[in-house]
Amino acid sequence: WARGLVAAWDGQLTKQSTAGAIYVRWESAVDDRALDPTTPQAERRALIEAGLQAAITRLTRDLGPDRSQWRHGRVHLSALPNMMVSTFDLPAVERPGGFGAVNANGANFRRIIDLSDLRNSVASNAPGQSAQPGSPFYGNLAENLGNGEYFPLLFVREDVEAGAAHRLTLQPR
């Protein structure tokens, strides 16, 4: 069943992809000799099959026997630990993509700057803008990270002022 699922797979590492979860675990389990063209065909087949069995064993161990729970997002997570106290850790976020994919990711902060029009610039900063637990901006962007969503990155003064939630004024003494 796993071979057929991966053979019919579209190659996209979406969070929901069962075939993607199997492939990623297979890729980490398969012996490098299986990909070496100088390895005899019969040995390569055996190594590939052993890698697939190892992937299934690992998915069963990590995610349980219910194959409907075998989703790529569950094996490709971004941890969101608090820098100071683990009590304030946020739940890990399921993410699409992965190493070797077009949507390779790892960083929780991204910026896309449009130098032709700064108003088109966007960013992602998970888990949020604030490192202070209890702030409404502490974990508010974690879901965006998992969905590959961005927020407008404000550069133009009137946009910054219109988008500000608070204003802090420092006055010298």
Placement of each model-derived feature along the sequence:
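C-terminal/peripheral segments of proteins
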Residues: G4, A8-R173
